[in-house]
């Protein structure tokens, strides 16, 4: 098992990519503490995975929740090797012309950047001492939208670019005892939601025609399941793999970037035209 003996904490582990990470990490021998906002999802994880998982129900947008997660993890499992920030929200490609004005725009900006950037900073701040003592790793979930345009609207894209900057700065500051990296997925089947300030909190990525769009945009021709991205997290969390990597962002985007802007937009427009429901500006979404 690639993670035997490793102790991991993760924010946002109750569904989608986060749940896939937790499930795989336990299968690889890790013990995992999870911060999850939904009591129902937390209880479901415990039923499925048993004593190798410790759950904290809380809101990752609070720095106190991150601190409580780390304390719970160390109290239960004795130490902490790896911290994973996986909280996020997608803006469903809401373009600048579609964004609200004034107070609502300010609220949307605050919500997206708090979830997509600040929650990761809170977890890094809370966990860095224990992870440093373990010569461990911090891993964030970035997005293909943090590497190139077209994976979201300006709020989401800017937040994911900010997260990439945070990865690199933390890697610089915490070396040589902590490796800080990120995985930047492309689209996937997930129940990732939108910001409430944009009225998108009840809408999930799974409810968009993402599969049809992504199969045309990606050179690989298929929309991955969340579990297909988890190998990268396992490698980055391992004590023996990826030991030379820090400040890196793994672009596991199915080749979105090499497709080219013109070809991607043509495929996206064609798929949306054939669907009765689509993202507001036809973006495909990311991790």
Task: Name each region found by the language model.
Residues 100-121, 139, 156, 163:
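Catalytic Tyr-X3-Lys loop
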Residues 90-96, 240-287:
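Short C-terminal tail/terminal secondary-structure segment
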Residues 124, 159, 167:
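Active-site helix of classical SDR
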Residues 143:
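Residue(s) in the substrate-gating loop at a strand-loop-helix junction
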Residues 2, 121, 130, 222-251, ...:
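C-terminal substrate-recognition "lid" of short-chain dehydrogenase/reductases
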Residues 135, 175-179, 241-246:
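Short, small/polar-rich loop/turn modules that mediate ligand/substrate recognition or access, typified
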Residues 7, 12-15:
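Conserved glycine-rich cofactor-binding loop
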